[in-house]
Amino acid sequence: MGILIVGAGFSGAVIAQELAQAGLSSTVIDSRSHIAGNCHTERCPETGILLHRYGPHIFHTDDAEVWAYLNALGPIMPFRNQVKATVRGAVYAMPINLHTINQFFGQTLRPAEARAFIARRCHPAHTPAVSFEDQALQMVGPELYEAFFKGYTEKQWGLSPRALPASILKRLPMRFNYDDNYFSHRFQGIPQDGYTPLVARLLDHPRITTHLNTPYRPDMAAAQDHIFWSGPLDGYFGFRLGRLGYRTLDFERFTEDGDYQGCAVMNHPDAKVPYTRVTEHKHFAPWESHAQTVCYREYARAAGPEDTPYYPIRLSAEQALLSDYQALAKAEAGVTFVGRLGTYRYLDMDVTIREALDTARHFLAQRR
């Protein structure tokens, strides 16, 4: 049985490993020169610092099986993402918490007092929020919205917050305590040696053959009984209906001596600052020690045909086009579409692994 897996990220590698353990051979191809997709990590040859080449990836989940699955691949070090934001010449904790509120407004409020204080500033929620801006004004009020969300959102999405759905902001918590952990999941960490060695272990099996620098060609399908596709959904169909919209990222890399900003992630919400954030990569591995530091300034823009896609836009125009592509995908015999690109969704790594496990198990169950 010929099985082709397109994409050597977590989706493809997990499926290949599950099939291999069940006795099925597969070929994994990837157009890039490396495995692990956008989770790829590599050592900086000049400094020895472990770099998250496509931006920071912190593993966080409440899925105990997925957490155990990841830990079986290699040591996972505890890590808490404590994001900061530089706003109008001051540094604040993100997401907004009691410290942020007290510092920003010059107060010393206790939790209940802070809730009432913010509630007085919020716009009344007479009707459900439709736009990002509506949601922000109902959730945090105009002062915090203008300072922390408006400019950042415009830079990240290239659109007015009035044109974005409220659901985007619903993913961002607001806390009335001093918890500055960006995530709230039970399990959180980063692989000691990065993500790429974990994916390499998944692909290291005699029944798995991996080819890098190998883009998919339609003529490859003839020799396969089944294809697992984790590339762009529209790309599989040759973009025949048009291209689904994505945002991409550009990174401006620079090296300094010592410690540049004292944290892994510093957001820059001010509209006058052209980049969205600065990431300092040695802080993603605090168990290591380095004399120098490597930082990335991160710029967001619309993705072109040759760019690496990061975030699906999924506005009304994309939703209509997505529905058409989903209909094509459903009718495509012998092909399973997986992963964030294959399903045109924003997926955290734990969900990616969970869905890959479930997909492989379902495929194997159907063959019995």
What are these regions (language model features)?
Residues 10-11, 33-35, 47, 99, ...:
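Short, solvent-exposed loop/turn segments at secondary-structure junctions
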Residues 2-28, 360, 364:
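N-terminal Rossmann-like FAD-binding beta1-loop-alpha1 element of flavoenzymes
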Residues 20-45:
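Glycine-rich FAD pyrophosphate-binding loop
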Residues 46-123:
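Dinucleotide-binding Rossmann-like beta1-alpha1 core, especially the glycine-rich loop
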Residues 308-368:
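C-terminal catalytic lobe of FAD-dependent flavoproteins
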Residues 76, 208-212, 335:
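Generic structural signal for residues in well-ordered beta-strands
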Residues 214, 218-328:
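Mid-domain catalytic core of redox enzymes
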